[in-house]
């Protein structure tokens, strides 16, 4: 029987937690400069000037104590690096500097951060400036005052004073990775509390999800899996080694795209860690759902709503829908439906019951999407581009009844070579087509999603091989083609409406219309 969804609540599949993303080119002065309670006007100065002051080797030469390199990834494709260095300061503290940067689809995303930390792990000052995505920037600092409070500066906001109570960490969003390293060091040093205050704002919930061995080259390494909530919207996953060092992070960036960072020497583990994050995240969501479950007989009757059956017929008024656990067993007018003895009855008079909704262009980037979708009445999503290991792990867990979420229809994202490419599944020549499509078919992908950097000459052979395997071909129209050429080459659909507009206008007219609309 067709799945139905009762639309009672709609939760946004967006997020708070990016409050540090301010659109400004100016930012804080160099670490340690100025009065901690100084006005916002003290934060002037270009990013380049500030970076020069904060990250230069001015003054007597000091030996670098430690250097850590993290490899940054988007959809498991390496896009940049973060290099963290530690240098002893004259006052006995350690100056940590993070140089974080990546290139996303041809756009540079640079970020710098600096921390001044005592031997006992107290962060005396923190600042970060630069870009957190192609479309957002961060510009802030927090300085520890003598009374134990932090004075927080964000450009465009009045300075505020925050005095943490109990264990706390200093971080703002997913980047830089160094901030998360300090956060987890503080969590361990504080006795692994369930919650910690977050400076500049927020509360963290941190939980160990257990330890597991992973094969690495010719040895096995045991890593502890830790989940963190409150730093970004939803849960992120991190892994620590036996000494508490941060090894890897699987999270979302400021565009809510899949983002991963892994310490140098552990790159080979990233696909397995990403898959583990998806599977464990769905398991965690199931645990949350079970803790909120109310007792019932297993049979539930929704009584009194208007029922729309999706066939085009008029709505059935004063309807009854009966389901037994996850199966709808009866639906229709109250007068014709017998409610089983012992069923839990819920009065939904005044509401409307619809067939489960479909989201036809989704990027199921984190496990919390499952609960949000179901609460919004969405029972099927078509995922049009994701980390294959992550999304198939989530899909399989839900299909096996071990997770919370809608049915997921997976597309396999493929792209060509070049700086603007997305993901790790690359088709550069005809020789790549068969093995790539065999991999996608084996993973249960229903469609091939072509991205923008695929060579136009490869579209037709990709479509031929995809259709042989019963897979549709959809996606972006590659650069160098128009939508008519893509359709003639075998496209079954395009993912964005703008690709349809070009053929409707004379040459040059579309760009004129775009400029007029922008004005």
Protein language model regions, located:
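Bacterial N-terminal signal peptides that target proteins for export
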Residues: 1-8
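Signature of exported/secreted
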Residues: 68-73, 81-189, 227-228, 239-241, ...
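Histidine-rich, glycine-flanked metal-binding segment
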Residues: 312-354
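Bacterial signal peptide processing site
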Residues: 22-24
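C-terminal motif of bacterial Sec signal peptides marking the signal peptidase cleavage site
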Residues: 18-20
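Divalent-metal coordination cores built from histidine and acidic residues
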Residues: 180, 346-354, 360, 369-519
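Solvent-exposed helix/loop surface patches that form functional interfaces
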Residues: 42-52, 58, 62-65, 132-223, ...
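Extracellular/periplasmic ectodomains of large secreted or surface enzymes and adhesion receptors
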Residues: 33, 260-304, 338
């Amino acid at each position: 029987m067709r799945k139905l969804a009762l639309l009672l609540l709609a939760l946004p599949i967006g997020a708070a937690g990016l409050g540090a993303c301010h659109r400004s080119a100016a930012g804080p002065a160099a670490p340690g400069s100025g009065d901690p309670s100084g006005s916002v006007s003290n934060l002037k100065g270009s990013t380049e000037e500030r970076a020069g002051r904060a990250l230069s080797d001015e003054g007597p030469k000091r030996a670098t104590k430690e250097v850590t390199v993290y490899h940054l990834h988007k959809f498991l494709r390496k896009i940049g690096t973060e290099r963290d260095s530690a240098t002893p300061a004259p006052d006995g503290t350690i100056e940590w500097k993070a140089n974080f940067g990546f290139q996303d689809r041809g756009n540079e995303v640079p970020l710098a951060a600096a921390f001044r930390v005592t031997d006992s792990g107290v962060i005396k000052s923190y600042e970060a400036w630069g870009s957190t995505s192609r479309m957002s920037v961060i510009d802030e600092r927090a300085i520890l005052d003598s009374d134990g409070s932090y004075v927080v500066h964000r450009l465009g906001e009045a300075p505020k004073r925050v005095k943490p109570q109990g264990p706390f960490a200093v971080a703002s969003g997913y980047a830089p990775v160094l901030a998360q390293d300090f956060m987890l060091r503080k969590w361990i040093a504080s006795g692994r509390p369930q919650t910690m205050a977050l400076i500049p704002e927020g509360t963290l919930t941190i939980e160990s999800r257990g330890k597991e061995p992973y094969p690495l080259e010719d040895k096995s390494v045991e890593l502890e899996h830790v989940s963190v909530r409150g730093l970004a919207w939803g849960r992120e996953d991190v892994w620590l080694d036996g000494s508490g060092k941060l090894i890897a992070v699987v999270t979302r960036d400021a565009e809510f795209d899949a983002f991963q960072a892994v310490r140098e020497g552990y790159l080979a583990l990233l696909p397995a860690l990403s898959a583990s994050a998806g599977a464990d995240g769905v398991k965690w969501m199931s645990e949350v759902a079970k803790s909120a479950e109310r007792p019932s007989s297993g049979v539930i009757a929704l009584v009194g709503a208007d029922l729309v059956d999706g066939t085009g017929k008029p709505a059935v008024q004063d309807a009854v829908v009966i389901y037994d656990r996850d199966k709808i067993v009866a639906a229709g007018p109250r007068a014709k439906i017998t409610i089983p003895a012992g069923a839990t009855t819920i009065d939904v008079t005044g509401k409307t019951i619809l067939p489960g909704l479909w989201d036809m262009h989704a990027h199921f980037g984190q496990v919390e999407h499952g609960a949000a979708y179901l609460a919004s009445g969405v029972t099927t999503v078509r995922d049009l581009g994701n980390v294959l290991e992550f999304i198939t792990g989530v899909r399989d867990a839900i299909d096996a009844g071990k997770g919370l979420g809608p049915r997921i229809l997976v597309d396999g994202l493929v792209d060509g070579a070049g700086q603007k490419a997305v993901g790790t599944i690359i088709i550069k020549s005809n020789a790549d087509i068969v093995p790539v499509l065999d991999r996608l078919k084996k993973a249960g992908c229903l469609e091939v999603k072509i991205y923008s950097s695929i060579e136009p000459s490869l579209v037709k052979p990709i479509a031929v091989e995809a259709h042989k395997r019963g897979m549709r071909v959809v996606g972006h129209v590659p650069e160098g083609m128009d939508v008519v050429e893509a359709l003639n080459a075998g496209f079954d659909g395009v993912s964005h409406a703008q690709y349809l507009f070009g053929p409707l206008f004379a040459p040059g007219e579309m760009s004129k219309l775009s400029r007029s609309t922008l004005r």
